[in-house]
Amino acid sequence: MAEKKERQRTEVVEHGNIWFIYRPKVRAEDEPEQDVDGIDDVERFHMVLRPDARSGGAARFRLMTIGAKRLPDTGEHERNWGFVDLVAKSAGQVTEALGEDHYDTKTRGERVRPAARPAGEGVYVLARTGSKMHLAYALELPDKPGPVQKQLNIEPEASFALSIKNPEKGSPRNTGLDSAGKADYPEKLQKEFRDRRFATEDPRLLDYEGAQFILIGAGSDVKRDLGIDLEPEDESEGTADIFKQLRLSKGKHPIEPLLTGEWR
C-alpha cells in the first residue's frame, strides 16, 4: 500500500484548456483547395495550452508544434519532439498564426498555406511526481474519436512524461531537435537546468519561443496513472472554448474534425 501512495503523490503545478490543431499542406495559388484525406495531407500538427490564471500560468497561450505530426503512442511509450512556436498574451496573436497565409517564392510562385483545422478540445494539467514532469489531458470534443483523432493519436485521455531541452546543450541523436530557433532564457531560468541536458521541474521554461521538449507516452488513464481527476465537461459546438477563448472563426477554420472527427 505504501508503494501505491508514493506513485500517487502528485503536485499539479498548472492547469487549463488544451486544443489540438492541424494545418493542411501548402498548395499553389492557382490550385483549388482540397479536403484533407489523412495524415499524409497534413503539414503540421499543433497543440495550444492556455493556462488558467489561477494556476499561475505566466503565458496566456502557448502554440506548440509536435513532431511526426501526431502525439506519441502511450502504449508503446513512444517519444516525439516538439517546440514552442509562439507565446502570446492575446488570442488574436494565435488565431493570426493559424490563419490562411499567402506568400511568394522565387522558384514556385505564390503559395498558399491553408487555415488550420481544430481537431480536439479538452482540459490539461502539468504535474510533478518526484523529479518528473507530466502533461496529462482529457478530451471534451469530439464526443467520440474519429479518423482524425485516431491518425493524430489523440486519445480520449492520455499522459506524457515531459522534458524541456537545455538550449546550451547539444541534442541527442534521432530526437528531431536542432539548434535553430532555440529559446533564449534569462539567467535565472537557465540555472534551472543545473548544467543538465533536460529539465523536468519548472513549466515556466515553456513560456519562451523556441523552447524545445520531448514527450514520452506514459498512459491512457490519468486517474490511475497520476491520481488526478481532470473533470472534463460536456461541450458542444455552442459551448466550445475554442470559439470563445481562442476565437477561431467557424467560417475560416472547418470544424468537422473537431465535432465529428472527420477530415476536412
Identify the residue ranges that each predicted region occupies.
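Compact, glycine/acidic-enriched structural inserts
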Residues: D73-D104
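Eukaryotic short linear interaction motifs
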Residues: R27-P32, V42, R54-L63, L71-G75, ...
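Long, contiguous regulatory modules within eukaryotic nuclear regulatory proteins
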Residues: M1-G67, R79
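Generic structural hydrophobic/aromatic packing signal, biased to beta-strands
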Residues: F20, L49, I66, F83-L86, ...
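Cysteine-centric segments in proteins
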Residues: E3-K5, V12-V13, Y22-P24, L86, ...
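Alpha-helical protein-protein interaction elements
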Residues: E11-E14, T95, I255
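A eukaryote-biased signal for long
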Residues: G109-R264
